[in-house]
């Protein structure tokens, strides 16, 4: 550290200078560290960096726009390419020529359209006869099934209502099936009872004839095999 000038009042040693001199003498701080601490950063450096960042962002935005324009030009290159434009022009010219020919033959075409086609026979090559036979079979089948298909198409709007009616009919059918099963069970039970009664009738008749012969009075109990007998002598 340079010695202070005793005649310069600004160079007179102060407390901070003495402390720094002590640190330098002890080796805790060197001159390079002091020189680095003396460097000051301008307050306009951040503004300069901000301006640079803004310029870079603007340049990036401009490049992105150029890239989008290039992509759009690439996508539309096939449309505006002279080769494809020439093909389209040729196609349009052909259609125009065809329409001109149709307009020129308008009268003959109208006469041909008014004339019934049943009076003309279209020639078909022999190699296509079998295909025509198959085609006619398909046409006949289609005509036969046309009415069914049309009826199906007409019923499409009423499909929900028809399904609802079908579900109701199925529910009623289930109820009828259940009632029929119960009725069949009752009929079987009744038949079984009738068979039992039929088998008991001869026994009852035999008992009545026996009681009648021996003057025995039987109380009127319907269809029972147990007879409570009361004789005249027991009274």
Swiss-Prot record:
Where are the annotated coiled coils located? 51-115
Report keywords, A-Z.
Answer: Cell cycle, Cell division, Coiled coil, Cytoplasm, Cytoskeleton, Microtubule, Mitosis
Q: Does the record bear Cell division in its keywords?
A: yes
> Among its keywords, does the record have Cytoplasm?
yes
Question: Predominant location of this chain?
Answer: cytoplasm
A Pfam cross-reference name: HAUS2
Gene Ontology cellular-component terms listed:
centrosome; cytosol; HAUS complex; mitotic spindle microtubule
The gene is HAUS2
Task: State the InterPro entries in the record.
Answer: HAUS2, HAUS2_metazoa
The domain of life is: Eukaryota
Q: Where in the cell is it found?
A: Cytoplasm, Cytoskeleton, Microtubule organizing center, Centrosome; Cytoplasm, Cytoskeleton, Spindle
Q: What does this protein do?
A: Contributes to mitotic spindle assembly, maintenance of centrosome integrity and completion of cytokinesis as part of the HAUS augmin-like complex.
| Gene Ontology terms: biological process | cell division; centrosome cycle; microtubule nucleation; regulation of microtubule nucleation; spindle assembly
What is said about its interaction partners and assembly? Component of the HAUS augmin-like complex. The complex interacts with the gamma-tubulin ring complex and this interaction is required for spindle assembly. Interacts with EML3 (phosphorylated at 'Thr-881').
Question: PANTHER family, from UniProt?
Answer: HAUS AUGMIN-LIKE COMPLEX SUBUNIT 2
Report what the protein is called. HAUS augmin-like complex subunit 2
User: According to its UniProt record, which protein family does this protein belong to?
Assistant: Belongs to the HAUS2 family.
Which species is this record about? Answer: Homo sapiens (Human)
């Amino acid at each position: 550290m340079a010695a202070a000038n005793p005649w310069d009042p600004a160079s007179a040693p102060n407390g901070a200078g003495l402390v720094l001199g002590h640190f330098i003498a002890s080796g805790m701080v060197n001159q390079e560290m002091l020189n680095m601490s003396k460097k000051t950063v301008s307050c306009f450096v951040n503004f300069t960096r901000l301006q640079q960042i803004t310029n870079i962002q603007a340049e990036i935005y401009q490049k992105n726009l150029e890239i989008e324009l290039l992509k759009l030009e690439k996508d539309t290159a096939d449309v505006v390419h002279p080769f494809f434009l020439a093909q389209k022009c040729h196609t349009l010219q052909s259609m125009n020529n065809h329409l001109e020919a149709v307009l020129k033959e308008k009268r003959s075409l109208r006469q041909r359209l008014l004339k019934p086609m049943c009076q003309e026979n279209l020639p078909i090559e022999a190699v296509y006869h079998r295909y025509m036979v198959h085609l006619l079979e398909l046409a006949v089948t289609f005509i036969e099934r046309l009415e069914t298909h049309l009826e199906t198409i007409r019923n499409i709007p009423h499909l929900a209502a028809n399904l609802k009616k079908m579900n109701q009919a199925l529910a009623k059918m289930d109820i009828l099936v259940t009632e029929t099963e119960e009725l069949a069970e009752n009929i079987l039970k009744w038949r079984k009872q009738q068979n039992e009664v039929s088998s008991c009738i001869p026994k009852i008749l035999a008992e009545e004839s026996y009681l009648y012969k021996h003057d025995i009075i039987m109380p009127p109990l319907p269809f029972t095999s147990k007879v409570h007998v009361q004789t005249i002598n027991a009274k």
